[in-house]
Each structure stands twice: as structure tokens, then as C-alpha cells.
């Protein structure tokens, strides 16, 4: 990827009972693409990232915790300002992911929203003229 970088910008928050809070926050920067992934980190992880002073703006944001209401706060998203939001979630999952609150916040940003339960495999790659977005639906397990 030439001059691209992948950086751990947050190492999570240690807790006794919530392993989601240990999620790493990763930032990729390359020609034509910036990407932010906060794993399953929840509101407290987002607050720590905001307080850290890290540069959070990204073209593409992988929605935290499958698009859960436990994260993806308005304050955090206002700093990220993604053009594209990727949501990894199973079709008809037991948790109701993605939740309506984050979906409304993503829409208010005007971001393109892509979901694995609807579009299948999501591939984002740097391209000379920006990012390349591809989806692949074949093979989605309708019963999952």
C-alpha cells in the first residue's frame, strides 16, 4: 500500500465484566482512503478516543458493535464524519443489530450505509481516484 499506515489509536478500557470495552481502535490512512474501526467498543471507548485528541475523521467508518445503541454516539460521529458506514451484522440476529438510533445518526450524516446482512461481503480498498467499494451477496445464509 505504499505510503499507507495502520495505527492503533486506542487500546480499549479495562473492565471486569465487559470484554467489548477491550476492543482496539484502528485507523488506516492511505492514498484515497481513510478508515476507522473501533471494534465492539462502547460509549466509554468513544469518549476516551474523543478525549485523547486523536484525529478521528475518516472516509469510511466500520460501525461500532454491529451498529448498537451502546456506541455510535452523535458526539463521536460528529468528529468522524464518515462518507460511508459499514455495518457488520447477521441477518435477523437476536440482538436487533443494527439499532434504530445509530441508523438514524448515520443517515443524518448523509453517509452511504452498507450492511453485511443486506449487501453481503463488503470490500473497501484504496484506489488512485478515491476508495473502491464492492459488495458480494452470493452465499449469504438466509437462515443466519
Identify what each model region corresponds to.
Residues 1-60, 118-144:
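Core dinuclear metal-dependent hydrolase active-site scaffold
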Residues 48-121:
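Cap/insert and terminal regions of metallo-dependent hydrolase folds
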Amino acid at each position: 500500500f505504499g505510503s499507507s499506515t495502520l495505527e492503533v489509536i486506542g487500546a480499549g478500557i479495562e473492565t471486569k465484566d465487559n470484554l467489548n470495552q477491550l476492543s482496539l481502535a484502528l485507523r488506516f490512512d492511505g492514498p484515497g482512503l481513510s478508515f476507522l474501526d473501533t471494534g465492539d467498543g462502547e460509549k466509554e471507548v468513544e469518549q476516551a478516543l474523543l478525549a485523547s485528541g486523536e484525529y478521528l475523521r475518516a472516509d469510511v467508518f466500520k460501525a461500532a458493535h454491529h451498529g448498537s445503541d451502546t456506541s455510535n454516539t452523535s458526539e463521536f460521529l460528529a468528529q468522524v464524519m464518515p462518507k460511508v458506514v459499514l455495518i457488520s451484522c447477521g441477518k435477523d440476529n437476536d440482538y436487533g443489530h443494527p439499532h434504530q438510533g445509530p441508523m438514524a445518526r448515520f443517515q443524518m450524516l448523509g453517509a452511504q450505509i452498507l450492511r453485511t446482512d443486506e449487501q453481503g461481503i463488503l470490500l473497501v480498498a484504496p484506489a488512485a481516484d478515491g476508495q473502491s467499494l464492492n459488495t458480494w451477496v452470493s452465499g449469504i445464509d438466509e437462515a443466519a
